[in-house]
């Protein structure tokens, strides 16, 4: 089966995924609709289920198809945030005058959540992570997306939410992961410490009767460490400080391109194919295009399909 690349398929994600060939994409980067956040008025939409369990069940079914489509060495990156139990009354989540963004929540969920009390955090991200792990995925890491410019909240009895989760899953024990593509530069003080031979080897002081050695590449006497022996980078940490980016389009929940780019650089080889079953405004496709990867997007909302195509096609980054 010939698969069209660099395209956005309009329709239900589960049905569209079933039409894609097995083991055909290298990586999936996505942010599914959050639970109870916004009603887009679509019959098959995800996020407005009666219970969190139903929401998680539907997402698990979608990602089961993603696993089928993913190559054996592929990775899945899922951006997801939590929801709170409310007072039991529902607000109107469809008024465009109140786009509360990725942190907002206009629908009360208290009456639908078993075991949750009013004002409880539901635990949606970990419910999803454990469900996907139980369904066969390897749960490899939980990245914290820390926002320097979070959406303000009116609450006075807890901290304002300023982070979301990015879970990395894999289909197999061994998989493609380019750690150097997203590596971080080491601090100048770290380089000086390593060059001085302090705190970088097996021992912090000489073994009695032996010269002090350090294990940069292999044991060497103290003072013999040169600049070319010291790696200028380190593996990326699991807290990513990335600000949200304003977007003038009609999609209220667009995540920043840098977030998608980081996942793609690590999880998809150059020339590979990135899948997003919840394409929204097209951020994943935009990031893939900018870095020499192909993309396949799926989006239920026809308006967002048009928006994403226009956004990706007009990008000159």
Region locations from a protein language model:
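Core catalytic lobe of class I
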Residues: 1-317
